[in-house]
């Protein structure tokens, strides 16, 4: 699309409007000029015209075909390349098959026929000729062909030539010297040699374009002073016999010159008489209507004695045949001076023509002799009076009707004057003696200024209406441009709104994505917190379970004695040590000596629990679960036995190797222990130690055990991967008990006499094992 696409579209719409009654050749020629000047590309122009050709309205299609015909004839090869191809021919054939309008069909056939004849010698346009032949074979009837319709004489601008130096001054082109092309000859020039600008009418370029100096001089040479050469004349005129004839006007003979001079004199005479009669008429008119007397066209003639000093012209009649008044009209100087004064003075309005024109003979026929008597003598006066009335009516505003009457009266007067002159010429009578001719001449001469004024008024009105038409066209173009600008503005606003909406959608999407990310993060944090809470709850539950398990295990590890301490006191002294209930109150069914577990968790737990309702081996364990084969006491071997047991396996803590860990064994009660004590426990005779405590009343007995504390209780807690302790070794006499090794420093160590120990029986452990009662320090 070229630079003038908007103008081209408007012109094309105007040239193909369905409201047209005839072809708009002005718009079509402007379209051709736009294409030839290069303002509109040929491809774009032809495609736009094709769209109009395919319009449903047959009038638009017909006018579009007219535009295409003119463009092909006037715009040269570029348009020919776009039209004379297979695609365009196929489109025209399809349109011919679809179209039902006769005029459009005939126009398509006419164009194909004309193009086939015009491009018959062009090999690259052979498709047009082939299409024409195919359509003839198919039976299409083409209209009558005229060879003049296929004359395509459209000159186009030459192609530009490329070179490295100026075509005129041979200057090499470089960075500072730019290339320029002449639009007239197509050669390449520098800036100095192509500094002129001119229009090129032969190429249809009506705007000033860059041309070289020789082409500028050739295009703008002066026409005056230069005769047109024979090469500029058309060849038809040069070959015709008219060119051989002389072009000078024929010479006039003496007789014709004399008749011309007589006619001029007669006209002058009639003008003088008409002026005199007009002056008299105005006097009478102003007497009836008192008004200011207007300035007459020319003052009355002065006396002949004071004006005429030159002799009478030889061409005038003889003195005895001419009256004295006629003699003064023969003075040429007088009439020349009279004409100068008439030009300087204002001329009155033309008179109103007669309502009933005078009778006149048929035009072009000879007038008989008696016609002269048929003309009334009052015709000049009547015509003059009518002219005055017309001037008054015209000044009062009756323009159209007055113009028509004036033109009709003038036509009648001129016709009568011509017929009278012809009649006098046929009869050989001099016009100077015909008063009717003189009066008619006077009336026509009087109406002549009014006719000129009327022509001027009509020209002014024509110019005025043409100006209005131009303004209307400008307004129409401005409205079209304004509508286009409004449409562009609306489109711009729509695009801006779409862009704003798109930006808003993008921002909303971004915000939504950010909120989604925040939500995901929040949900992830909540999930982590929930998992952490679940883990904490699970850990707490596991800890509670572990504590419960530890409690159960610790309870299971604690020995439960169902025999009261009173029964132990009744036991014989030879069977074992008597434990006196000299500690704090103990719970039934449990073993809790005073001072042994104070401050430990087990002490607090047992002290806070209520007394069980029934006595048994252990509150949380059923009595039936007690195994009678288990030993009924903790076994604490001597130091040598403890070292030997520690060396046998990795079990047990390494911090206190002097003792071996105990293994809790549920017992059946103190009855079994008391019954077996005289057999398993050796006789211990040791003086009482100060600082030792035990359930022996006033006698203190030292036992072979380590003090019971929380540090020594740690290895027995669950969760320690400690194997079971080695089996208890029997007590060996002669060794020092463990409690003497760990005795407090307040007293000297006590010597323990050897005690005879019997080996355990091979029977059940409840009957053959040696039991020792635990004493807490």
Curated annotation (Swiss-Prot):
The modification Phosphotyrosine is found at residues 308, 329, 334. Residues 258-277 form the UIM domain. Residues 225-541 are annotated as: Interaction with SNX1. Residues 292-311, 645-658, 753-777 have a biased composition (Low complexity). GO terms for molecular function: phosphatidylinositol binding; ubiquitin binding; zinc ion binding. It is found in: Cytoplasm; Early endosome membrane; Endosome, Multivesicular body membrane. Involved in intracellular signal transduction mediated by cytokines and growth factors. When associated with STAM it suppresses DNA signaling upon stimulation by IL-2 and GM-CSF. Could be a direct effector of PI3-kinase in vesicular pathway via early endosomes and may regulate trafficking to early and late endosomes by recruiting clathrin. May concentrate ubiquitinated receptors within clathrin-coated regions. Involved in down-regulation of receptor tyrosine kinase via multivesicular body (MVBs) when complexed with STAM (ESCRT-0 complex). The gene is HGS. Residues 452-570 are annotated as: Interaction with STAM. The modification N6-succinyllysine is found at residue 549. GO terms for cellular component: early endosome; early endosome membrane; multivesicular body membrane. Zn(2+) 1 binds at residues 166, 169, 190, 193. Residues 659-698, 730-739 have a biased composition (Polar residues). Component of the ESCRT-0 complex composed of STAM or STAM2 and HGS. Part of a complex at least composed of HSG, STAM2 (or probably STAM) and EPS15. Interacts with STAM. Interacts with STAM2. Interacts with EPS15; the interaction is direct, calcium-dependent and inhibited by SNAP25. Identified in a complex with STAM and LITAF. Found in a complex with STAM and E3 ligase ITCH and DTX3L. Interacts with E3 ligase DTX3L; the interaction brings together STAM and HSG, promotes their recruitment to early endosomes and decreases STAM and HGS ubiquitination by ITCH. Residues 223-319, 338-370, 645-698, 712-777 are annotated as: Disordered. PROSITE patterns: UIM (PS50330), VHS (PS50179), ZF_FYVE (PS50178). Residues 443-541 are annotated as: Interaction with SNAP25 and TRAK2. This is Hepatocyte growth factor-regulated tyrosine kinase substrate. GO terms for biological process: endocytic recycling; protein transport; receptor internalization. Residues 478-777 are annotated as: Interaction with NF2. Residues 15-143 form the VHS domain. A zinc finger (FYVE-type) spans 160-220.
């Amino acid at each position: 699309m070229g630079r003038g696409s908007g103008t081209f579209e408007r012109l094309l719409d105007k040239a193909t409007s369905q409201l047209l009654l005839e072809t708009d050749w002005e718009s079509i020629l402007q379209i051709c000029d736009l294409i030839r000047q290069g303002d509109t590309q040929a491809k774009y122009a032809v495609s736009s015209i094709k769209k109009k050709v395919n319009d449903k309205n047959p009038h638009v299609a017909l006018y579009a075909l007219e535009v295409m015909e003119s463009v092909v004839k006037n715009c040269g090869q570029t348009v020919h390349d776009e039209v004379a191809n297979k695609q365009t021919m196929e489109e025209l054939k399809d349109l011919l098959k679809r179209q039902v309008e006769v005029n459009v069909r005939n126009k398509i056939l006419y164009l194909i026929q004309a193009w086939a004849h015009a491009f018959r010698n062009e090999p690259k346009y052979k498709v047009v000729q082939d299409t024409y032949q195919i359509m003839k074979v198919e039976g299409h009837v083409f209209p009558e062909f005229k060879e003049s319709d296929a004359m395509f004489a459209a000159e186009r601008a030459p192609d530009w030539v490329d070179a490295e130096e100026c075509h005129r001054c041979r200057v090499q082109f470089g960075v500072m010297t730019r290339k320029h092309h002449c639009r007239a000859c197509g050669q390449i020039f520098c800036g100095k040699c192509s500094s002129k600008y001119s229009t090129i009418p032969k190429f249809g370029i009506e705007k000033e374009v860059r041309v070289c100096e020789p082409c500028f001089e050739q295009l703008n040479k002066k026409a005056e002073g230069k005769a047109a050469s024979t090469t500029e004349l058309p060849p038809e005129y040069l070959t015709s016999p008219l060119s051989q004839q002389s072009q000078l006007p024929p010479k006039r003979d003496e007789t014709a010159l004399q008749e011309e001079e007589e006619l001029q004199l007669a006209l002058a005479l009639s003008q003088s008489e008409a002026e005199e009669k007009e002056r008299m008429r105005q006097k009478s008119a102003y007497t009836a209507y008192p008004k200011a007397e207007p300035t007459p066209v020319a003052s009355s003639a002065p006396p002949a004695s004071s004006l005429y000093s030159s002799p009478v012209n030889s061409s005038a009649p003889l003195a005895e045949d001419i009256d004295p008044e006629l003699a003064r009209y023969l003075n040429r100087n007088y009439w020349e001076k009279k004409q100068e004064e008439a030009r300087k003075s204002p001329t009155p309005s033309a008179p109103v023509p007669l309502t009933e024109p005078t009778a006149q003979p048929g035009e072009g026929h000879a007038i008989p002799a008696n016609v002269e008597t048929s003309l009334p003598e009052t015709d000049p006066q009547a015509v003059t009076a009518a002219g005055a009335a017309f001037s008054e009516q015209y000044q009062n505003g009756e323009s159209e009707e007055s113009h028509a009457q004036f033109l009709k009266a003038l036509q009648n007067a001129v016709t009568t004057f011509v017929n009278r002159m012809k009649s006098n010429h046929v009869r050989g009578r001099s016009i100077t003696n015909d008063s009717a001719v003189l009066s008619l001449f006077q009336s026509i001469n009087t109406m002549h200024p009014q006719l000129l004024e009327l022509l001027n008024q009509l020209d002014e009105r024509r110019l005025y209406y043409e100006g209005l038409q131009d303004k209307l066209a400008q307004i129409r173009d401005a409205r079209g441009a304004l509508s286009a600008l409004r449409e562009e503005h609306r489109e711009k606003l729509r695009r801006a709104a779409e862009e704003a909406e798109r930006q808003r959608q993008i921002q909303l999407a971004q915000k939504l994505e950010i909120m989604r990310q925040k939500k995901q993060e929040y949900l992830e944090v909540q999930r982590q917190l929930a998992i952490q809470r679940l883990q904490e709850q699970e850990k707490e539950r596991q800890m509670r379970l572990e504590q419960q398990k530890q409690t159960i295990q610790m309870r299971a590890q604690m020995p439960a004695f169902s025999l009261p301490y009173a029964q132990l006191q009744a036991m014989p002294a030879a069977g074992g040590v008597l434990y006196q209930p000299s500690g704090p109150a103990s719970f039934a069914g449990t073993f809790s000596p005073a001072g042994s577990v104070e401050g430990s968790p087990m002490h607090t737990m047992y002290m806070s629990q209520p007394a069980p309702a029934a006595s048994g081996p252990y509150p949380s364990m059923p009595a039936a679960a007690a195994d009678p084969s288990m030993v009924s006491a903790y076994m604490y071997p001597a130091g040598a036995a403890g070292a030997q047991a520690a060396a046998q396996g990795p079990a047990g803590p390494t911090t206190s190797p002097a003792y071996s860990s105990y293994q809790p064994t549920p017992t059946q009660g103190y009855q079994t222990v008391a019954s077996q004590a005289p057999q398993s426990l050796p006789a211990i005779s040791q003086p009482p130690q100060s600082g030792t405590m035990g359930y022996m009343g006033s006698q203190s007995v030292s036992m072979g055990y380590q003090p019971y504390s929380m540090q020594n209780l740690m290895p027995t807690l669950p969760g320690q991967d400690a194997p079971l302790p080695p089996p208890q070794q029997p007590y060996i006499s002669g060794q020092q008990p463990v409690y003497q090794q760990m005795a407090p420093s307040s007293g000297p160590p006590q010597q323990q006499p050897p005690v005879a120990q019997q080996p355990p029986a091979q029977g059940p452990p409840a009957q053959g094992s040696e039991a020792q009662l635990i004493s807490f320090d």
